[in-house]
């Protein structure tokens, strides 16, 4: 429904090595097998058939007693299926300028992002990083309910995100989606240059799509999205969005996921 409403294209996973999982599929019935796989309905059907043929079935006293030869068991085969796994790494500025209204926008948007990506990937993991001047990994509940009073150093989140990718989500086996939300404030122009270097040289070559959503705040300068647009905006796997309020969420999701990455 989301895809139809926003006219989103289906995602095409990167040409990566897929993880192969094995599943047992029941394919029929056979005469031998473990008791745990006995097919009781077919066993009783075979016993009834035998009793009807031999004339031992009594309709007045319809007792069906299967013999050893009547027993039937499910047959199976192991089927190998490729599974394409993905991870979303959410990052969010939790400094004082990101209030409850901004976090609510991020929460709603992340719900729909999760919903869309789960449609395309059986194995979807989500990780959460919060940052002010220092970044740390947290659980989902902490992600949406933490507020700090310090300044903002965005590079700390990007460094932690890249370390996470290097350690656990190699691009040969994973489709990686980092999403970062902030109000556009950063500690300094020098730190913004560090962010750009991390993105351009280290993160973008390893991910399917990097998305930055700038949530409007009365306290944020809004400069960061401008800097990203000038430096990494032309990259094919970068998507930048400015989110003025809740009414802009749908347009932001379409901007993020409209590339089919």
Go through each PLM region and give its residues.
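Acidic/polar low-complexity segments with low predicted structural confidence
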Residues: 1-84
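Acidic, glycine-rich A-domain
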Residues: 38, 43, 67-68, 75-89, ...
